[in-house]
Design a protein with these regions (language model features):
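Membrane-embedded alpha-helical bundles of multi-pass transporters/translocases
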Residues: 1-177
Length: 177
């Protein structure tokens, strides 16, 4: 582990790792909620996302309270992820039903290519961490260096794959002020 060295017990490191894993599964939902809510706000509708969020928070609390005695602390990040995905899906359904949002062919094509590039990068990262497993496990002094190297290589890999499959072009990368 990267952060265990005496600051946390082995059990605390494992538990933190599990919690981060389940919170990470909710990251796309958190981003989608922000995006989808903006469509409502742009149409002067702040109530719909608010009520959906209230229901999602209630769902989060109910799941957490009910399952905590059976599963323990890990239900909190799981419930947060479940309720966030629920929130984003309900917002999306409302947007579609109100004709406020529609996928076009360009978006769908690029989205699928970006998903492919992301999955490929994840697999490449898994390969790199397996390749550097001994260095990551035994050489504390170099652990940050190996991790930094893995991240840099993955970013380069992601951009190369993305350009190769035409997930985006150079015009998409330019910042517009």
């Amino acid at each position: 582990s990267l952060f265990g060295y005496g600051a946390f017990s082995n059990e605390a490191v494992i538990n933190s790792s599990k919690a981060l894993y389940y919170f990470a599964l909710g990251l796309p939902a958190f981003a989608l909620i922000k995006i989808f809510s903006s469509f409502f706000f742009a149409n002067h509708d702040t109530k719909t996302p608010f009520y959906i969020s209230l229901f999602s928070v209630a769902l989060n609390i109910l799941i957490s309270l009910y399952y905590f005695r059976y599963i323990g602390f890990i239900i909190i990040p799981i419930a947060t992820t479940i309720s966030s995905w629920f929130n984003s899906i309900v917002l999306f359904i409302y947007l579609i039903n109100r004709s406020l949002f529609r996928f076009n062919n360009t978006f769908t094509s690029k989205f699928l290519k970006i998903i492919f590039a992301s999955i490929s990068m994840g697999l490449f990262f898994k390969f790199l961490t397996s390749f550097f497993e001994n260095q990551l496990a035994y050489y504390y002094e170099y652990k940050i260096l190996f991790l930094f190297l893995c991240v840099i290589l993955c970013v380069v890999f992601y951009f190369l794959i993305s350009i190769l499959i035409k997930a985006f072009n150079s015009k998409d990368l330019k910042l517009k002020y």
